[in-house]
Amino acid sequence: MLGILLQKATATLASGLNSSRAGMFPIALGLLLQLFFDHALAESTFLDKAFSLQAALLPMEHKKRSVNKCCLLTPPPPPMFPPPFFTETNILQEVDLNNLPLEIKPTEPSCKITCIIGPPGPSGPQGPQGIQGIMGPKGEIGEIGRPGRKGRPGVRGPRGMPGSPCSPGPIGPRGEKGDIGLTGLPGARGPMGPKGLTGQKGEKGIIGEKGQQGIKGEMGVMGLPGMLGQKGEMGPKGVSGAPGHRGPVGRPGKRGKTGLKGDIGPPGIMGPSGPPGPSGLPVMSGSGHLMVGPKGERGLPGPVGRCDCNLPQTVVNPSYNKFPTLINPPQVPAIFVVDSEDELEKLNTENALAFRKDQKSLYYRDTVGWLPIQIAPIQQMRQNPTGFCGDEIVQVENGEECDDGNRIVTDSCINCKQAYCGDGYLQSGLEECDGKDFGYHTCKSYLPGSYGELKCTSYCYIDSTGCRYFT
């Protein structure tokens, strides 16, 4: 019975705490202590032996018998604590008084009250605390009380120790399908998938309306002039276009370069030799060569020679018999033998003959230098070549490629050779320059206001990167 009271008191306290205020806890605790003390007195056997109930009630019956006029009952002792004042709920109404261990049944008075009940008297002094009674037998289990309100969640306990590993049990039957759960958090971004197929071409959109023309902005400040960039590389030579109409005759070109020295012509007919001067005494040198003496005085002029046109007059066959005998004819002082042309040029002797061993030919000294008398033996002498450069006949055997019969160096045939880029001659209409020949162009005429030197590329075009402007 005490356990039931404790449970109800605890429920009452919990409901009082939840429904009313936290200050109701001391009042409920005082009520619980009073009930516990009354139960202890009722179950105690010691009081039954020491003070029996009949012995205790004898004085009261004696008083009842002696007093016949009026019978007054003393009020019960006041509680230890004042009763609580509830505005919302009353905890005492929930206590079942029928289940209390002590049945408080009012005793009917043996005498009838005939007098008027007066006002209640003052409360008497509190009696002494009684001796704790003996705990009675355990009562029957009472009915299940009403479920109390849900309490606050308690503090989370410490994590338990992991259990001992054991073999997994058999797989149970498949449970029923649960309710649909809440949407989970978005997962991490997965890897990029393969490229999809190309979709169909969409329809052409409608042309939008033309927007309004904006306000014309203010004119900006004039920027600084940029730097002169480098001239780009010359591109490849383009395909030659169709020849244009013949232009007007240009001004005469400059004088061409000196041509190559032509072949030496055949030696002419030797004239009669003049009278030789007096010969000096030869002096023998240490090397065995003859030393030429000093030059003698000029001799007298000889008579006019005659020409015999019937027989060819050569060095071998001169027509001496036709001429009159000269008085004191000039004599050759010596004939020198040399190995090469260098040794021949070192000889400065006049009226002398020299024989070159490398050509096996004979030379004589003239005022202009050494001239050949016989280049080769008579039977090996070649005849005069037929044709020459400028006769308007192409002589392939002479190495001619063309023959226009003029000496103009600005056309396509120069010195019986085809003109080409790099020969040093500017070809009119096809080349801008060639070598050092720029025609009449300079930096000043090609780029007005500049100075410097023009250059000619390998494709015979003018390169003006060498020209500079005045800054």
Swiss-Prot record:
InterPro entries: Collagen, Collagen_superfamily. GO terms for biological process: extracellular matrix organization. Residues 1-30 form the signal peptide. It is found in: Synapse. Residues 70-86 are annotated as: PRAD. Anchors the catalytic subunits of asymmetric AChE to the synaptic basal lamina. The asymmetric form of AChE is a disulfide-bonded oligomer composed of a collagenic subunit (Q) and a variable number of asymmetric (T) catalytic subunits. The N-terminal of the collagenic subunit (Q) associates with the C-terminal of the catalytic subunit (T). Belongs to the COLQ family. Residues 118-282, 293-307 form the Collagen-like domain. One of its GO terms (molecular function) is extracellular matrix structural constituent conferring tensile strength. The proline-rich attachment domain (PRAD) binds the AChE catalytic subunits. GO terms for cellular component: collagen trimer; extracellular matrix; extracellular space; synapse. Residues 155-164, 242-251 have a biased composition (Low complexity). Expressed in electric organs but not in muscle. Sequence repeats lie at residues 388-413, 420-443. The keyword Transferase does not apply. This is Acetylcholinesterase collagenic tail peptide.
